[in-house]
Design a protein with these regions (language model features):
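Short, basic, glycine/proline-bearing loop/turn elements
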Residues: 35-47, 103-114, 233, 253
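N-terminal basic, low-complexity leaders that serve as flexible interaction/assembly modules and, when applicable
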Residues: 1-88, 221, 297, 326-340
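Short connector loops/turns at beta-strand edges and beta->alpha or beta->beta junctions
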Residues: 28, 101-102, 157-158
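Generic secondary-structure transition motif, activating predominantly at the C-termini of alpha-helices
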Residues: 10-14, 34-41, 110, 168, ...
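Active-site loop segments of alpha/beta catalytic cores
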Residues: 117-340
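Glycine-rich, aromatic-flanked loop segments that form ligand/cofactor-binding clefts
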Residues: 5, 9-25, 66-96, 116-160
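Glycine-rich, proline-tolerant flexible connector loops at the mouths of alpha/beta enzymes
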Residues: 68-90, 96-114, 198-216, 317-319
Length: 340
């Protein structure tokens, strides 16, 4: 087992100081990222270029000394193995070739031979692991079945997921089957990335908060538990990120995982109380990093004052904003180290 501060904290073991990394830490707020992104030509081309994807994964670790790297990719990439086609326009979120809103369309979402995206991401993972310092952990990630299903049904990013919820209520059995297919596909994908060298996995249920606790329990928890359960055999820490999910924390306590990443809508003590035996990751509001460095330091110290003494990973409650000043990220990281 790698002697990593991050991995120890995931397992609830004592550490000399809290580990720190940032969701979307490889990205547009970094000038060095923008140079490589221009070289690749597009976001998707960058994701599909193992050498360049590895380079942008390493950039924030070099600059800030983060305790973990997260592979540069996107949650939609492994869907190509199911015959799903999409593109990323320069503005706005991803666009699927077609929205898949009916059981007949969901039945076509099935494993295809020759999907190359998973292999490209695995190659990037292997390159990063070979280049990373021994003590820095490498995280691989995927989308949770509910969040991926929302992209499939809506055909794009949605603010309220109305069509997806209507489809779930109208065709519960077929929708549950779609979620089961997504769970199995994501489990196989992450197993491959662990074989390639990932030290931990994070499952992003970004749209978890759009469901009531009852619907989340009935529809989202079974496939999510299947996915996490499959990953138990890898032996690596499993982290669940659930966005906007304060009302779901008691429900999430049933999901097999080592750590839960929470957003700023819930307090760290509140999350720890509702998720006994789990490490907690988070939860600074990314908006705080758009203020002055002094404000960043104050907000970070406030978060640290509330954090559990053991089993806490310092992070944001959501991905970092592209317009974030680099100096503010440095202030965030330095404060974690100084206070500790």
């Amino acid at each position: 087992v790698r002697a990593s501060r991050f991995l120890a904290a995931c397992r609830g073991e004592p550490v000399d100081r809290p580990p720190v990394w940032v969701m979307r830490q490889a990205g547009r707020y970094l000038p060095e990222y923008l140079r490589v992104r221009a070289q690749a030509g597009s976001f998707l081309a960058l994701c599909r270029h193992p050498e360049l994807a590895a380079e942008v994964t390493l950039q924030p670790v070099r600059r800030f000394g983060f305790d973990a790297a997260i592979i540069f990719s996107d949650i939609l990439l492994p869907l190509t193995a199911l015959g799903v086609e999409f593109e990323f326009p320069d503005e706005g979120g991803p666009q699927l070739r077609e929205a898949l809103a009916t059981p007949r369309q969901w039945a076509r979402v099935a494993p295809r031979a020759g999907g190359t995206d998973a292999a490209l991401v695995a190659e990037a993972v292997a390159r990063v692991r070979a280049a990373l310092p021994e003590e820095v952990a490498l995280i691989a990630f995927c989308g949770a079945p509910w969040t991926l299903a929302s992209y499939l049904v809506e055909g794009a990013t949605s603010r309220d997921h109305t069509r997806t919820k209507a489809a779930l209520l109208e065709y519960p059995q077929a929708f549950a089957q779609l979620l089961a297919t997504l769970a199995e596909t994501m489990a196989a994908y992450l197993e491959g990335l662990v074989r390639a060298g990932a030290d931990a996995v994070q499952v992003f249920d970004s749209w978890a908060g759009s469901l009531s606790a009852q619907l989340y329990q009935e529809f989202a928890i079974p496939p999510l538990s299947t996915l996490m359960g499959r990953l138990a055999a890898t032996g690596v820490p499993r982290i669940l990120y659930a966005g906007g999910a304060s009302h779901l924390l008691p429900t999430l306590a049933a999901v097999p995982c080592e750590a839960v990443s929470v957003d700023w809508r819930v307090s760290l003590p509140g999350a720890a109380a509702l998720l006994p035996g789990r490490a907690i990751q988070g939860n600074l509001d990314p908006a705080a990093l758009l203020a002055s460095p002094a404000t960043v330091r104050r907000a970070t110290r406030q978060m640290m004052a509330e954090a559990p003494a053991r089993g806490w990973i310092a992070n944001l409650g959501h991905g970092i904003r592209p317009e974030t000043p680099v100096a503010n990220v440095a202030a965030f990281v330095e404060t974690i180290r100084e206070v500790a």
